[in-house]
A protein has these predicted regions:
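Conserved short alpha-helical segments that host acidic/polar catalytic motifs at enzyme active sites
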Residues: 1-351
């Protein structure tokens, strides 16, 4: 995954300083053996429970704000029946950054924690973590902690990203050099920003997807989500109000798509279905090659969610499925290949 990311360096923009990129990153499974050691470093004995990890950006030079952020995280995790192992300073090498990337670089830390309920597993655990994260984000926003950002908070996956060039990712994040840092999948992205200015927060992948393209219907989609929020209801969450607003403040079109995709996943829609709801396939009732079941499915989905239209190639995961797909007009490049040893690659280029 890291080598593949380095190979698409040409897909991204580079600042005049020659080292600052629009953003690059990688989304992988939490490497369990790697983080067991990190838990034990905190002075705790690993008890075979699911290790949950949060990858967090804090304001680098505002120490009071850092403490406020950490206090909110600790408080809400504890309130929601999680136990905190401790905080971990993520080892980084700022020397590989360009001047602009270094000037805006956040403090990068991880929080290691577990659920106090051993029966809370998989989707149920992820749902609880998601709701807790939304509470944390909303509280931080209410007190104007603007440089606080959670890249990932999960028992399943973790995201390493920033405003460096793709080839510098493992030189910047030293964790990625560790032999125990393994995963069954990797979603990687090299950004060329179009609608929004580059920032550490808007580097991709996001929590559920990586997106190449633009959402031309974004303003309408955002307004429709505000309408849908009024009708949102589910027994799966403690309080549905904790999840609002679904689209976070300051989100780019790609980040907003990720917000909605993630909510659908966490609410029980598998990644392939969430993709069809948001970025539907091209279809017509006149298409005789399409089965009646598929026509009925697409017709139903069309009545439940407005399409997020525009040039788009996405890769995403709900921690069970890993998907890659095009928009219905095929306006962004996406190719796939299966190797002789059964590795599936999908990306903007082949070879």
């Amino acid at each position: 995954g890291i080598e593949a990311l380095k190979a698409v360096w040409h897909r991204g923009a580079v600042d005049a300083d020659g080292k600052t990129g629009d953003g690059a990153g990688i989304h992988v499974e939490i490497p369990k053996d790697f983080f067991i050691e990190k838990v034990e470093v905190t002075g705790h004995t690993y008890d075979n429970s699911e290790i949950c990890v949060g990858m967090i950006f804090l304001p680098r030079n505002d120490y009071a704000a850092q403490e406020n952020c950490k206090t909110i995280v600790e408080s809400e995790l504890t309130k929601n029946d999680f136990s905190i192992y401790g905080w971990r300073q993520v080892p980084v090498n700022p020397k590989v950054l360009g001047e602009k990337a270094f000037q805006t670089m956040p403090e990068i830390i991880q929080v290691l924690f577990k659920s106090n309920n051993p029966e809370l597993l998989n989707k149920d655990l992820e749902r609880k973590i998601y709701e807790t994260r939304r509470i944390i984000e909303n509280k931080a926003f209410q007190i104007s902690l603007n440089n606080f950002y959670i890249c990932s908070l999960s028992s399943k996956s973790i995201i390493y990203k920033g405003m460096f060039l793709a080839e510098a990712i493992s030189e910047f994040f030293l964790d990625l050099k560790d032999e125990r840092f393994v995963s069954r999948y990797a979603i990687f992205h090299q950004r060329f920003s179009t609608n929004t200015a580059p920032s550490w927060n808007l580097a991709q992948p996001f929590r559920a997807i990586a997106h190449n393209g633009e959402i031309n219907t974004y303003r309408g989609n955002k307004n429709w989500m505000k309408v849908h929020e009024q009708e949102m209801n589910s027994p799966l969450f403690d309080n549905i109000e904790n999840l609002k607003p679904v689209i976070q403040q300051g989100a780019s079109d790609s980040a907003a798509l990720d917000n909605v995709f993630e909510l659908l996943n966490i609410s029980g829609q598998p990644a392939p279905l969430a993709k069809l709801m948001l970025i539907p396939d091209a279809w017509s009732k006149k298409n005789k090659t399409l089965s009646k079941d598929h026509q009925q499915l697409f017709n139903f989905l069309n009545s439940t969610m407005e399409p997020w239209d525009g040039p788009a190639a996405i890769a995403g995961t709900d921690n069970e499925w890993v998907i890659a797909a095009n928009d219905r007009n095929g306006l962004r490049p996406l190719r796939y290949a299966i190797t002789k040893d059964n590795l599936l690659f999908a990306g903007s280029e082949t070879g």
